A protein has these predicted regions:
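ATP-dependent carboxylate-amine ligase
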Residues: 1-14, 35-38, 250, 287, ...
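N-terminal leader/targeting and accessory segments in enzymes
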Residues: 1-92, 262, 269-270, 293, ...
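Acidic, Mg2+-coordinating active-site environments of NTP-dependent enzymes
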Residues: 9, 70-76, 171, 196-346, ...
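Short, well-ordered alpha-helix to beta-strand connector turns
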Residues: 23, 35-36, 61, 77-78, ...
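Short internal beta-strands
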Residues: 62-68, 233-237, 375-376, 399-406
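Structural beta-sheet core signal
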Residues: 136, 178, 198, 235, ...
Length: 492
C-alpha cells in the first residue's frame, strides 16, 4: 500500500521523502525493523521509541512516523512523516492497512469499572441466540467462530485491534463486541472506531496512579469518551457518576437500572442456590416486560443482564433470543462454580482489588452460607494499598480466610502475605485466617477443611491459566486442579 493511502484521514507534515513510498506493514517495535516496513515512533510511559528511529533506518525501514523532531541527517533515504500524535496516527493507519473492517460490522463497546467482562459475555450469548456471528475482545481474550486467543491488554494496541477486526470479518463475523478500557481510550487504541452501541456499567475509583490516570475525574472523563463515539449509549441510570460521565455525549441514550426512570428496570429479584448453582431471577418492566433467569449470583448480575437485554432491544433482537441467551450464559472466571461436592459450594472469581472483592463478598453473603470462606493473595510488584484493602475487606466480611500467593512476580510471597496481614488486623483483629504460601496447597486445604453448607470463593486469578513466580509463568488452571483433587479424594 502506498504511504499516501495509509495516511488517509491522518493530519501530517511530510518531513522528507515521498508519499509514493510502498509500505508492506506497520510496526511499533524497533526489534522488528526490516525493509518495506513503516516504524511508528511512540512516546511511552517508560521509553520514547524516537530513540530507536536511526537504528530502524539503518535496518532499512521504508518510512518513519514521528511525533517530535529528530536528527534526519543520518537517514537521507527514509521517508519521514511528522504527526501531532503517533498513537492516533497508528490507529488510523492500521485501520486503513486492514481495509477499515470495523465499518463493515455492527460495533458494540462496553466500558465501566466492574462488569465489563460479564456484560460482554452476556451480550455475546444474546447475540448468538439470535443467530448473529460474533467476535469478542476483552480481559478473557479474543473469541470468534469457535477460536480463542490470549490478549496482553483488555483493549489491545490499535494495530492488533484492527488486525483482529480483519480476522473477524474474514471469518464471517457480522458483529464485533469489545471491552473498552479507559487506557484504551486515553492511548488512542480505539481511535477511528465508531460504535453502533456503547455500554456503561458503573464507575468507582480504579486505575489511578503512575502510568495510569492522575485523578478519578480524569479516569471518568476518559470513560465518557465512548459516548462521543457511538450512535446509542446504553447506560446504568442508578450509578452516581452517570450524569458527570455523560457530559458532552453525542449519542442517543437508553437507560437501565432499578430506578423508576429507567427504560428497562428490574424488580422483584430472587436469589437462587443449590450446591452447584448460584443465580438470580427477576422481572423486567419499562419499554418491555420479561422474566429473566441468570446463572450468576447477586445484584450486579441483575445490572449486567439488564445492560445485555437493553443492547438486544436496541439492535431489534427477538425477546426469546434475549431470554435464552441470558439464561444460558456462563463466564469463565467470573463467579464460576466448580461443582465438586454436594456438601459445599466452591467458585472461582477474578476479584483482585478492594472494590471487586467487597462487591463479590456482599453478593455471596446474601446467600446465607454456613461459612463464607475466601482463598486469596495479591500480585507482586503492585500497590501495597491493594493488599491492605483486600485484607481489610476479607477480615470484615469472611468467616475464614486462606492467605496465599497470587502472581508474585519478583516479590517474595511471604512479604506480600505480611502486607495482607496488616489489612486483616485492621479490618478485624479477631479475624480467623491461615497462611499457606503455595496456592495449590491452599486449594487443597480449602477442600479438606470445607464444612457442610460452606461457600468457598477462590479469588484473584479467575480465568488465568498460569502463575507467575520470579517472572516465570507456569501452567496453573484452578478449575482443573480442583476437579483433579476432588477425583483423588473421591468427593461426592
Amino acid at each position: 500500500m502506498k504511504l499516501e493511502q495509509l495516511l488517509e484521514g491522518v493530519p501530517f507534515t511530510l518531513a522528507q521523502g515521498s508519499l509514493d513510498t510502498e509500505i508492506s506493514d506497520i510496526i511499533y517495535d524497533s526489534r522488528k525493523a526490516a525493509p518495506g516496513l513503516l516504524f511508528v515512533c511512540i512516546v511511552g510511559t517508560q521509553r520514547d521509541s524516537h530513540e530507536f528511529a536511526a537504528d530502524c533506518a539503518a535496518k532499512g525501514v521504508s518510512a518513519l512516523v514521528i511525533q517530535h523532531d529528530i536528527d534526519l541527517s543520518a537517514m537521507p533515504g527514509v521517508t519521514v512523516v511528522k504527526v501531532e500524535s503517533s498513537r492516533y496516527a497508528m490507529a488510523l493507519m492500521s485501520a486503513n492497512l486492514f481495509g477499515n473492517p470495523s465499518r463493515q460490522m455492527t460495533m458494540i463497546g462496553v466500558t465501566g469499572t466492574k462488569g465489563k467482562t460479564t456484560t460482554t459475555h452476556m451480550i455475546k450469548s444474546v447475540l448468538e441466540a439470535a443467530g448473529r456471528k460474533v467476535g469478542m475482545i476483552g480481559t478473557n481474550g479474543i473469541y470468534y467462530m469457535g477460536r480463542h486467543k490470549e490478549t496482553a491488554n483488555t483493549t489491545p494496541e490499535s494495530y492488533e485491534l484492527q488486525k483482529t477486526f480483519r480476522e473477524f470479518l474474514d471469518a464471517g463475523c457480522d458483529t464485533a463486541l469489545m471491552e473498552v478500557s479507559s487506557q484504551g481510550l486515553m492511548m488512542d487504541r480505539v481511535a477511528g472506531v465508531h460504535y453502533d452501541v456503547g455500554v456503561f456499567t458503573n464507575l468507582s475509583p480504579d486505575h489511578i496512579g503512575p502510568g495510569e490516570h492522575k485523578t478519578f475525574e480524569e479516569y471518568r472523563s476518559w470513560k465518557g469518551q465512548l459516548f462521543q463515539r457511538c450512535d446509542v449509549g446504553v447506560v446504568n441510570i442508578d450509578d452516581e457518576n452517570t450524569e458527570a460521565l455523560l457530559e458532552g455525549h453525542t449519542c442517543k441514550l437508553v437507560t437501565y437500572g432499578r430506578s423508576e426512570q429507567a427504560d428497562y428496570r428490574a424488580s422483584g429479584y430472587e436469589l437462587l442456590r443449590t450446591h452447584d448453582f448460584l443465580g438470580v431471577k427477576f422481572h423486567v418492566t419499562g419499554k418491555d416486560e420479561m422474566d429473566v433467569k441468570v446463572n450468576m449470583p447477586g445484584e450486579f448480575s441483575v445490572y449486567n443482564a439488564l445492560a445485555a437485554l437493553a443492547v438486544g432491544k436496541v439492535l431489534g433482537l427477538p425477546d426469546q433470543a434475549i431470554h435464552d441467551g441470558l439464561g444460558k450464559c456462563v463466564v469463565k472466571g467470573r463467579v464460576e462454580l466448580v461443582p465438586i461436592s454436594k456438601k459445599f459450594t466452591i467458585l472461582l472469581d477474578y476479584a483482585h482489588n478492594e472494590v471487586s472483592t467487597e462487591s463479590l463478598l456482599t453478593t455471596l453473603r446474601a446467600y446465607n452460607p454456613h461459612r463464607l470462606v475466601v482463598v486469596f493473595g495479591c500480585g507482586g510488584n503492585r500497590s501495597k494499598l491493594r493488599r491492605y484493602g483486600m485484607g481489610e475487606i476479607c477480615a470484615k466480611m469472611a468467616d475464614f480466610s486462606i492467605l496465599t500467593e497470587d502472581n508474585n512476580r519478583f516479590e517474595k510471597v511471604e512479604d506480600i502475605i505480611a502486607d495482607i496481614r496488616v489489612g486483616m488486623n485492621k479490618g478485624n483483629p479477631e479475624a480467623k485466617f491461615v497462611e499457606i504460601p503455595d496456592r495449590l496447597d491452599a486449594l487443597h486445604y480449602a477442600v479438606d477443611h470445607a464444612q457442610e453448607g460452606d461457600l468457598i470463593a477462590v479469588i484473584g486469578k479467575g480465568h488465568e491459566t498460569y502463575r507467575d513466580r520470579q517472572g516465570v509463568k507456569t501452567p496453573f488452571l484452578e478449575r482443573e486442579l480442583l476437579e483433579e483433587y476432588a477425583q483423588q479424594k473421591g468427593l461426592e
